[in-house]
Regions:
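N-terminal helical cap/lid subdomain that shapes the substrate entry/recognition surface
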Residues: 2-82, 103, 107
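Short glycine/proline-enriched coil/turn segments at helix->beta-strand junctions
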Residues: 26-29, 62-67, 91-95, 114-116, ...
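Serine/threonine-rich low-complexity intrinsically disordered regions
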Residues: 24-27, 49, 64, 92, ...
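Asp-based, Mg2+/Mn2+-dependent phosphohydrolase catalytic module
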Residues: 1-6, 85, 89, 97-202
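Alpha-helix boundary recognition
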Residues: 35, 76, 89-92, 201
Length: 202
């Protein structure tokens, strides 16, 4: 077996957090602008509480504070993408872990919606937000895994770069069909997780 462990991004690779943002914001376009604003506030920035980032991101795009509190209260409602419940049980022979930009509390709530994992490494615990390599490395250290024996399932282009810089091979579930990053290359790119099984079994 080439890999002994598989890591996952949580909020894009496993869960459809975009639809939750859209539902709370009152529309897909508004929700995606909120999501993007929140991402821009944490990416490459010093760590600060994730909940504050969500609140500030709402303000950036003109969404009222009460909506941010509603989103945080409904965090556990983010549902797995349709193929996730079929794929994850077939990976039980691997150590499975998550690396997420969530806080400890929100990470635990959201991960429970996705499945069962050996570790949920949050940005709060690592003291840095992805794509900084520290959260990925913290997960590897916590599970005493060698990076070359781990495949990471990225949810975003930034995740591809972050996980690659931490030394892992990357499978990219490019659900948004966005352009490939310029700083790293996934060993396989698909629109969902179905290609993951083919790759591991091939």
């Amino acid at each position: 077996m080439r890999y002994e462990a598989i890591g996952f991004d949580l909020l894009t690779a496993l869960l459809d957090s975009w639809s939750l943002f859209a539902d709370v914001a009152g529309g897909r376009e508004r929700g995606m602008r909120w999501h993007a604003a929140s991402q821009s506030l944490l990416r490459g920035k010093p760590y600060r509480p994730f909940e504050d980032v969500i609140r500030e991101g709402a303000g950036v795009v003109g969404i009222e504070r009460s909506k941010a509190e509603e989103l945080l209260g409904r965090w556990g409602e983010a549902a797995p993408w349709p193929n996730v419940p079929d794929v994850l049980p077939r990976l039980n022979s691997y150590t499975r872990f998550i690396v997420t930009n969530c806080s400890e509390r929100l990470g635990a709530v959201a991960a429970a919606s996705a499945g069962t994992f050996d570790l949920v490494m949050t940005a709060e615990r690592a003291g840095a937000y992805k794509p900084d390599p520290r959260p990925y490395r913290a997960a590897l250290d916590a599970l005493t895994l060698h990076r070359k024996r781990v495949l990471f399932v990225a949810g975003s282009a930034h995740d591809v770069g972050g996980a690659s810089r931490a030394g892992m091979d990357v499978y990219w579930a490019n659900r948004g069909r966005v352009p490939a990053p310029t700083d790293a290359t996934a060993i396989r790119e698909e629109e969902d997780l179905r290609g993951l099984l083919d790759m591991l079994e091939g």
